[in-house]
Regions:
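Cofactor-binding active-site loop characterized by glycine-rich and histidine/acidic residues
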Residues: 9, 20-23, 35-128
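N-terminal capping segment at the start of a domain
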Residues: 13-29
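N-terminal hydrophobic or amphipathic helices/low-complexity stretches enriched
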Residues: 1-16
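Histidine-centered catalytic micro-motifs
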Residues: 32
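A broad, low-specificity signal for short, low-complexity segments enriched in glycine/proline
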Residues: 2-4, 28-29, 88-91
Length: 129
């Protein structure tokens, strides 16, 4: 990987971490440790590896991602927002009763989420069928 690409990925991951911390702080609820620990992996997947199109999030030929530790939604939601699936401003609705950014990833309300998860360990079994 060229140096400029790596630098850009690091900057994106740092921005996503800041957004995740703000989300958890503003909601006074969430799982910051688990969310921050996977940010580099999510950044590389969504910005360098996976074939996804924010303009066509249900493309049948897209790569799919299952966030098995669904309680770490403060990691996935900022990545999806920065990738263009929805506006960054939507993150302000995290864990609000009138919003769609739940504490566990939710596929029915958030474009780019391929599976609703929450119970630890359910994601891997569902992902492989």
């Amino acid at each position: 990987m060229e140096k400029t690409k790596l630098t850009q990925l690091k900057l994106t991951a740092a921005k996503a971490r800041l957004l995740a911390v703000e989300m958890v702080h503003d909601a006074a609820s969430g799982h910051p440790g688990g969310s921050l620990s996977c940010m580099d992996v999510l950044t590389d997947l969504y910005f360098s590896q996976m074939r996804v199109d924010p303009k066509n999030p249900h493309d049948p030929d897209r790569d799919r991602f299952v966030m098995s530790k669904g309680h770490c939604s403060p990691a996935l939601y900022p990545i999806l927002a920065l990738r263009g699936f929805f506006p960054v401003e939507n993150l302000k609705m995290f864990r609000r009763i009138d919003g769609h950014m739940s504490g566990h990833v939710e596929m029915h309300y958030n474009p780019g989420v391929d599976m609703s998860t929450g119970s630890l360990g359910q994601g891997i079994s569902a992902a492989v069928g």
